[in-house]
Swiss-Prot record:
ZnF segments: RING-type: 53-89
Entries under InterPro entries matching the protein: 7-in-absentia-prot_TRAF-dom, E3_ubiquitin-ligase_SINA, Sina-like_RING, TRAF-like, Znf_RING, Znf_RING/FYVE/PHD, Znf_SIAH
Zinc finger (SIAH-type) in chain: 106-166
Pathway involvement of the protein, from the record: Protein modification; protein ubiquitination
Gene label: DIS1
Name the record gives this protein: E3 ubiquitin-protein ligase DIS1
Compartment(s) where it occurs, according to its Swiss-Prot or TrEMBL record: Nucleus; Cytoplasm
Amino acid sequence: MASVTYIDDSGSEVIDPPKTEVLDVTELAGDPVPHSPKPNVVVSSSVRELLECPVCLSAMYPPIHQCSNGHTLCSGCKPRVHNRCPTCRHELGNIRCLALEKVAASLELPCKYQNFGCVGIYPYYCKLKHESQCQYRPYSCPYAGSECTVAGDIPYLVNHLKDDHKVDMHNGCTFNHRYVKSNPHEVENATWMLTVFSCFGQYFCLHFEAFQLGMAPVYIAFLRFMGDDLEAKNYSYSLEVGGTGRKMIWQGVPRSIRDSHRKVRDSYDGLIIQRNMALFFSGGERKELKLRVTGRIWKEQ
């Protein structure tokens, strides 16, 4: 299992390499394509501090504002300080620090997800866009029963789901899950993460939700892939539900956990069962939900 790495995106970014040298800033960079890594060549801490907003402590991007005394501020924080310099309290006006903007344009920085495996070096003004799409960026916790803010790589999240959310773990590519609810009419909007499956060396999450589709109460079951969307397309799955001699079958491609469970649900990308049909499948007097969901995961050739 790969080593666990955890990133807390709520704090400010820190780049702390083993050896620090000043980067050559004589070349303006406008190409978003990553450059080959340059060992031990990074922006000095003093330059990074110059580009740090004194209010939000984030990296500054054009327009970078300055007061008459030369103190700088990012454009996002300017309205928050009511046009007063947070350092000297002088009026800010509309002075831009063009020199600092040009210095920033000439810098190259490593992706903040380098500890996850990204080796690219990016121009300063392209770095944020890359990081928002970086294939090595951490995944958000896929647990759908509550709003969980944990993020990390896949091995970390698997352990987190097992230990912290007590999600059932299952080895194998076929499954047979029975869902029972004594009073299904009480459940209008609810979500459950039933099981995490391990097969083909990958992990898949089975979700089951109750929600309103227009005026009709329905259930939806779907599978999400614990990995990137490109990898998810290598797999397919089927879900089957039925009873009293009838059955419904769904076949599809698992969605990546990059897509939230709400996004998958709202796109109706799964097996949808109307509550009346689910109660019919349950048999009896249709007062208790007893729904058996079976399924299979396979790898496309």
